[in-house]
């Protein structure tokens, strides 16, 4: 879900924080991409003309594999090196949200069945997309595909967005890539959005700079986390009557969530704002401040030659893809992943940093106990096909 209304607030109060780029201008960058969010997008967007998911002759869904293969090729062709980060175990506080999502999917499934009988094609398509869920099998197949492509894979102990942010903070990648704005709440210095969108959408890449966002909002990191929780996050019920404008006003007026909650408790129903009886915001804040992640210095990322025979076996023989297209895709991977990229021009200049309006408060780093990809073994936690190519190309 991300953070409700945050993009609009940043556009209004911190416009310098948001820049748009053509994908080709990001050559030389390494990016940690939220895999689960990307796979979800592919399952929704990569469809047949009738709106149904792509399948092979055996009736197996292939939308996620088709999307992942060709969108990753596009990213690599533009000189970007992606690493895909998969979700681990969700925080306990998130279980309520996940349960409600399941209920909504079941409702959409029932409405979809009714639409097949009495509704239009558009109704059926709409309800079908609302029932989409990324399954364990989807994740396993995508990890297998990425390993065969020579793309690094990380399985986070918990939230993928938090792990993406950790790798960006630790200098393993330049940016985190996700549609979820809570990646910023996990303290990602740079967030790329729309990176895995279809080229046909002609949607530019949106780059959001956390430092500029904090300066524009005139907040420190602790206050920013409070604002995001108040706007509405994955861990708590939203407060009725609180929208983006009122959330920003409350945080500025009371300095943080502690003062806001005290005010709302003492003035129940004030201006229609009603805080739930059970609203453990302190627990939610701890998840954002000290997420369960693999420390960046224990993760190495390596991009290697694709396993062409393995790709043909998996995509062509098992999943029914076109062999010629798969082989051509593998050639592109080999060419672009292992070519010596021209250095970025901005790497030759030192930029004098602007004075901070409000410095971000330090965010602690919890050492995660999550598992790493099965291929990852060694003195350090190695991910996918890994060695020493870990620093971002500035």
UniProtKB/Swiss-Prot annotation:
Residue sites binding Mg(2+) 1 per the record: 34, 87, 159, 161
Any GO molecular function: 5'-3' exonuclease activity
A Pfam family assignment: XPG_N
Major enzyme class: hydrolase
CC per GO annotation: mitochondrion; nucleolus; nucleoplasm
Region (Interaction with PCNA): 341-349
EC code: 3.1.-.-
GO biological process, one term: base-excision repair
Protein name according to UniProt: Flap endonuclease 1-A
Naturally occurring in which organism (per UniProt): Laccaria bicolor (strain S238N-H82 / ATCC MYA-4686) (Bicoloured deceiver)
The organism's taxonomic lineage, starting at the top: Eukaryota, Fungi, Dikarya, Basidiomycota, Agaricomycotina
Recorded name of the encoding gene: FEN11
């Amino acid at each position: 879900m991300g953070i409700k209304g945050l993009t609009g607030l940043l556009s209004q109060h911190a416009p310098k924080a948001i820049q748009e780029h053509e994908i080709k201008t990001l050559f030389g960058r390494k990016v940690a991409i939220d895999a689960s969010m990307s796979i979800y997008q592919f399952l929704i967007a990569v469809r047949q003309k009738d709106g149904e998911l792509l399948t092979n002759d055996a009736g197996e869904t292939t939308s996620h594999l088709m999307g992942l293969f060709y969108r990753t090729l596009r990213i690599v062709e533009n000189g970007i090196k992606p690493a895909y980060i998969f979700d681990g175990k969700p925080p306990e506080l998130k279980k309520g949200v996940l349960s409600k999502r399941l209920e909504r999917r079941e409702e959409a499934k029932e409405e979809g069945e009714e639409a097949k009988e009495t509704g239009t094609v558009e109704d059926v398509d709409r309800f079908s997309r609302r029932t989409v869920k990324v399954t364990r099998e989807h994740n396993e197949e995508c990890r297998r595909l990425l390993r065969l492509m020579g793309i690094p894979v990380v399985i986070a102990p918990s939230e993928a967005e938090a792990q993406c942010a950790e790798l960006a903070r630790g200098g393993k990648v330049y940016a985190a890539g996700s549609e979820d704005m809570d990646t910023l709440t996990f303290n990602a210095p740079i967030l790329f959005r729309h990176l895995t969108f279809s080229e046909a959408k002609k949607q530019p890449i949106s780059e959001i700079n956390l430092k500029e966002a904090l300066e524009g909002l005139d907040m420190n990191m602790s206050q920013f986390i409070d604002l995001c929780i108040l706007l509405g996050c994955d861990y708590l019920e939203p407060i009725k009557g609180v929208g983006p404008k009122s959330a920003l006003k409350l945080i500025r007026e009371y300095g943080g969530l502690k003062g806001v909650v005290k005010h709302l408790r003492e003035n129940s129903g004030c201006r229609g704002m009603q805080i739930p009886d059970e609203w453990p915001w302190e627990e939610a804040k701890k998840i954002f401040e000290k997420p369960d992640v693999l420390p960046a210095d224990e993760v190495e990322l390596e991009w290697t030659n694709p396993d062409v025979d393995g790709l043909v076996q998996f995509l062509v023989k098992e999943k029914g893809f076109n062999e010629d297209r798969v082989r051509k895709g593998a050639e592109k991977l080999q060419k672009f992943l292992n070519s010596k990229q021209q250095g970025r021009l901005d790497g030759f200049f030192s930029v004098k940093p602007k004075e901070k309006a409000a410095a971000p408060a330090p965010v602690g780093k919890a050492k995660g106990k999550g598992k790493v990809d099965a291929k990852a073994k060694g003195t350090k936690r190695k991910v996918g096909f890994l060695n020493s190519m870990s620093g971002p190309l500035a």
